[in-house]
Amino acid sequence: MKAQPKASHFIDGEYVEDTDGTVIESLYPATGEVIARLHAATPAIVEKAIAAARRAQPEWAAMSPMARGRILKRAADIMRERNRALSELETLDTGKPIQETIVADPTSGADAFEFFGGVAPAGLNGSHIPLGQDFAYTKRVPLGVCVGIGAWNYPQQIACWKAAPALISGNAMVFKPSENTPLGALKIAEILHEAGLPKGLFNVIQGDRDTGPLLVNHPDVAKVSLTGSVPTGRRVAAAAAGNLKHVTMELGGKSPLIVFDDADLDSAVGGAMLGNFYSTGQVCSNGTRVFVQKGIKTEFLKRLKARTEAMLIGDPLDEATQIGPMVSWAQREKVVAYIEKGKAEGATLVAGGGIPNNVSGEGYYIQPTVFADVTDDMTIAREEIFGPVMSVLDFDDEDEVIARANASEFGLSGGVFTADLSRAHRVVDRLEAGTLWINAYNLAPVEIPFGGSKQSGFGRENSLAALEHYSELKTVYVGMGPVQAPY
């Protein structure tokens, strides 16, 4: 098997196997070929990982942020040196085209290690509060053992986005990747260990929906950070609340992308395509409700159709390929069902809508699909599809489109394309979402916070804001004189 790791889990600085766990087969989405066979964590493996993290964390927390940061920056350097191999593994794991993974996956993970390794001494500062002759100060302290639960669309990136702020803040982490993409996180653990991270501080265990509750409900876990669907987020948040654990939830979305009639049309079309077809549409922040002002709708659709039908679908390891397969057969079938629902409910099919015939029949391929004349009540306009399906809706004026854009339970992202920057800022101020773009879409550098509102979650990934979610404030009052007591 072309991507078989040394063992299923990485615990306390070494690979660990336990064949008593349920078998997890890793399939290459382009062909359906089994590329690795692993085992889900048993309760004993979960205990072993959490015990290793708990044992290692106090000594790590006692190190200076600068010393911790040096290790993270070394890990970033190693990732960049091995970017090609890591990108190919990510493509095998996810089916995403190599032309994407080589610029967007391990590289963004390395950016996270470099960023947090460099800024933590400033980001973890406390404050001094003068109180007359007395004074107080605050300091940021780590939470302890953190659990990270990853999704299958950006497995290496997500592992790094969670590990970097957790580790630099002085925590230890047990990370569970998605069972669909189990391979990349093991390499991240290997690289961190090679960079000098002490044993037990970043552990990776495999698992499925039965493994998550063992982690979330464990009494030694202080924080849970999940990237996943809204239903999963609700279950995890409810379980974590039972023990008052800290939580970060980066969940799904049905985000609006608004194109006004004064926008640069080619840029707007490009933004809509990036916001719907990148990673074969498997991006939580995608702007899948594309609102186009009526006066430019015909020309917008004409250019969109031409560019969509020109996209190259094929082998993800071919650098010319622009669209790869879905991550799994089940996900493809889910997306196909949504496409059929769009047709049945009266949306106009502009492009795609079927299975491409120029690729392996065993792969999980689907054509990038555009629907027009979509109304707000259609299923494809209300529910997260998580595939390459764009819904184009038309609108008349600003107030109307803002009201319709906000009429969703989700609030992860949104975008505005317009030449009028006053209007752009006015609109984003009124949109109910955590992450917004003006004349751009789906750019998420590690320097800026990323996260949602409403049913799309809470807490923030990346930037200095992430440190607030992996640490807590300790307040110290210092009395400088005798205590005055009334008794």
Curated annotation (Swiss-Prot):
It catalyses: betaine aldehyde + NAD(+) + H2O = glycine betaine + NADH + 2 H(+). Binds 2 potassium ions per subunit. Its cofactor is K(+). NAD(+) binds at G150, A151, W152, K176, P177, S178, E179, S229, V230, P231, T232, G252, C284, E384. GO terms for biological process: glycine betaine biosynthetic process from choline. The modification Cysteine sulfenic acid (-SOH) is found at C284. SUPFAM superfamilies: ALDH-like. Pathway: Amine and polyamine biosynthesis; betaine biosynthesis via choline pathway; betaine from betaine aldehyde: step 1/1. K(+) 2 binds at L244, K454, G457. PROSITE patterns: ALDEHYDE_DEHYDR_CYS, ALDEHYDE_DEHYDR_GLU. Keywords: Metal-binding, NAD, NADP, Oxidation, Oxidoreductase, Potassium. It is an enzyme of class 1 (oxidoreductase). The active site is at K162 (charge relay system), E250 (proton acceptor), C284 (nucleophile), E461 (charge relay system). K(+) 1 binds at S26, D93. Its EC number is 1.2.1.8. One of its GO terms (molecular function) is betaine-aldehyde dehydrogenase (NAD+) activity. The keyword Oxidoreductase applies. The keyword Plastid does not apply. Dimer of dimers. Involved in the biosynthesis of the osmoprotectant glycine betaine. Catalyzes the irreversible oxidation of betaine aldehyde to the corresponding acid. Belongs to the aldehyde dehydrogenase family. This is Betaine aldehyde dehydrogenase. It comes from Rhizobium leguminosarum bv. trifolii (strain WSM2304).
